[in-house]
Amino acid sequence: MTMTDATNDAAMRPMSEALDEELQALQAAGLRRTMRAVQQRNAGTVMLHGERIADFASNDYLGLAADPRVARAASAVLQAEGTGAGAARLISGNHPIHDSLERALARFKGCEHALLFPSGYMVNIGVIPALVDARDVIYSDTLNHASLIDGCRLSKATIRVFPHCDLDELGAMLEADRGRYRRALIVVEGVFSMDGDVFPLDGLVDLAQRFGAWTYVDDAHGTGVLGARGTGAIEHCGVTGRIDVVVGTLGKALGTSGAWVAGTQTLIELLTSRARSFIFTTGTPPAMAAASLEALRLAEVEPWRREAVRERARRLRGRLRDGGREVTGAADGHIVPVVIGDPTRTMAVVAELRRRGFLVGGVRPPTVPAGTSRLRISVSAVHPMELVDALSANVLDVLRKVFG
């Protein structure tokens, strides 16, 4: 049999058979993923298979996802306007509350204007290709989120990947490429979703100004939590108004759904005409926009929420470190990773914690690099402190039993 014959035979196999083989390979490598149905989110807990357990796996950092005031705001607009936008916003799906939310988000982030998208993924795969193309170069942090990586690839720009948070190497790349491309775009996260650390955005701005590069910061995990006003990593690093493209999400600290990009009026007007993932999709349901507007208001007028997040993060990190476990990120960072390494062992720890009444994230490749599978623990303002202490004790106990 020739190689061509073998290839043809493989291609002609029934889909179910070929895909089942791939699933079995994922299973053997400890990389097969499944979903679980959770409901009745309340005070940092959820119902799972009829049992109420502590949820340390969500991104509901401020505890707003189940706030009744947010639900009432959505309900009022739901009754008045129905369930959906009905069309893309450029056709007949633009609602006054979309405009109100965009103005509020722009003000919150210290930008001129903002544009809503259905998700953060859709922001990144739409905005980046609208700004750069094959004539340009992108500098991307090696630990950037998959949506940023995909947006960079879709742009067809040359992509230079620099070591995580390494401004010296980024500067060397910018120097080496000086004058070779039409545009240079530096793409980073404000808070890295799997490591919990903050990019040094003040240094980023200095480099960008020196080399004439544009800056793109996805602050999905900083928004609502970091900074004196809770506006995110950009405020935390003291560079409000100095980032060219600011991305944020509604589905994490603000507890609703959707995302946005903010910047100058000119930027937003261009994206309205060029970002394909905005143009060719139905508008956000007005009720969800209403919920987001109320959640944003609460995040601003209830600063106790972000301080509670920081207190709980400091407590959890301190207990884990006292128990001999290394955790990365800032001392009060709300994302607490505990690297285990092997994906199968990681999921075994997750399963045992679940049996004990704690839901934590088990993160494996390709979400994180091979050999760095981990627990991803996230704290919420509404977690009782005694629950944080109980989690830390159980994590340490399970890890001792797994690793000795």
Where are these regions (language model features)?
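PLP-dependent enzyme catalytic core of the Aspartate aminotransferase-like
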Residues: M1-T2, P68, R72-A76, A80, ...
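N-terminal "arm"/small-domain region of PLP-dependent enzymes with the aminotransferase-like
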Residues: M15, L19-T83, A213
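Conserved N-terminal alpha-helix of the aminotransferase class I/II PLP-enzyme fold
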Residues: R72, A76-S119
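Conserved PLP-anchoring active-site segment centered on the Schiff-base-forming lysine
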Residues: V127-A146
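Active-site phosphate-binding strand-loop segment of PLP-dependent enzymes
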Residues: R160, H164-V217
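Conserved active-site segment immediately N-terminal to the catalytic lysine
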Residues: G212, G232-L250, E269-S273
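PLP-dependent aminotransferase class I/II
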Residues: V247-T249, A253-L320, R325-T328
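Conserved PLP-binding catalytic core of the aspartate aminotransferase-like
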Residues: E307-R317, R321-G357, T367, G371-T372, ...
